[in-house]
C-alpha cells in the first residue's frame, strides 16, 4: 500500500515522503497512530500543492532574512556599561545585552541566536554573529563604552573652548 508520511518515521522516511509498506502495517499502526495517510490521487495533489506553498514560504523567509542581515551589518551597536579605570567591565556584556541594543534600534532577534566568540569583559570593539534563518547570518559590530564616559567627554568640551 502506498502511503504519505505525516511524521518522521525512523525506519521509513521523513514527513511528506510517499512510501510503500505492507497493508497490515499501514492499516493497523501507521494510519491509526497518525504517522501516515493513504496515498490517493487527491492526497498526492494536496501534497504537491503543500510542498509548493512550503517552498514559497521558505523563499519568502530567506528573502526577509537577507534584507535583515544587510540592515544589521550596516549597524554599529553602542553598549554602555559600568567599567573600572583600567577598562575592565564590572560583569560581562552578554548576548541578552546585545539583543536589547538591537531591539532599541528596531531589530528584534532572539538572544540565543547571537553567538559571541568570547565573553566581552573589557571596553573596546567586538564582533558577534547573529544566525537569522537557516544558513543566513549577519556580522554584528559592537562598541562597548563606559557609562560615565559620554558625560565626562561632553563636560570637558565646553571648558576647552573657553
From Swiss-Prot:
Q: Which PROSITE patterns match?
A: RIBOSOMAL_L9
A GO molecular-function descriptor: structural constituent of ribosome
Tell me where the signal peptide lies.
none
Query: Keywords for this entry?
Result: Ribonucleoprotein, Ribosomal protein, RNA-binding, rRNA-binding
Q: Which domain of life is it from?
A: Bacteria
Gene Ontology cellular-component terms listed = ribonucleoprotein complex; ribosome
Q: Which InterPro entries match?
A: Ribosomal_bL9, Ribosomal_bL9/RNase_H1_N, Ribosomal_bL9_bac/chp, Ribosomal_bL9_C, Ribosomal_bL9_C_sf, Ribosomal_bL9_N, Ribosomal_bL9_N_sf
Enumerate the Gene Ontology biological process terms: translation
What family, per the record?
A: Belongs to the bacterial ribosomal protein bL9 family.
Q: What does this protein do?
A: Binds to the 23S rRNA.
Q: Which NCBIfam families match?
A: L9
Write down what this protein is called.
Large ribosomal subunit protein bL9
Q: Which organism is it from?
A: Chlorobaculum parvum (strain DSM 263 / NCIMB 8327) (Chlorobium vibrioforme subsp. thiosulfatophilum)
Amino acid at each position: 500500500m502506498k502511503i504519505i508520511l505525516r511524521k518522521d518515521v525512523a525506519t521509513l522516511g521523513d514527513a511528506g515522503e510517499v512510501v510503500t509498506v505492507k497493508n497490515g502495517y499501514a492499516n493497523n499502526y501507521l494510519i491509526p497512530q497518525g504517522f501516515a495517510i493513504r496515498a490517493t490521487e487527491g492526497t498526492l495533489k494536496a501534497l504537491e500543492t503543500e510542498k509548493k506553498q512550503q517552498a514559497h514560504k521558505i523563499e519568502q523567509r530567506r528573502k526577509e532574512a537577507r534584507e535583515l542581515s544587510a540592515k544589521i551589518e550596516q549597524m554599529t551597536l553602542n553598549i554602555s556599561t559600568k567599567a573600572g579605570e583600567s577598562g575592565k567591565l564590572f560583569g560581562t556584556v552578554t548576548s541578552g545585552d546585545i539583543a536589547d541594543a538591537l531591539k532599541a534600534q528596531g531589530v528584534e532577534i532572539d538572544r540565543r541566536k547571537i553567538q559571541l566568540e568570547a565573553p566581552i569583559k573589557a571596553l573596546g570593539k567586538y564582533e558577534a554573529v547573529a544566525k537569522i534563518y537557516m544558513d543566513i547570518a549577519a556580522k554584528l559590530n559592537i562598541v562597548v563604552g563606559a557609562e560615565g564616559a559620554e558625560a565626562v567627554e561632553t563636560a570637558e568640551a565646553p571648558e576647552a573652548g573657553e
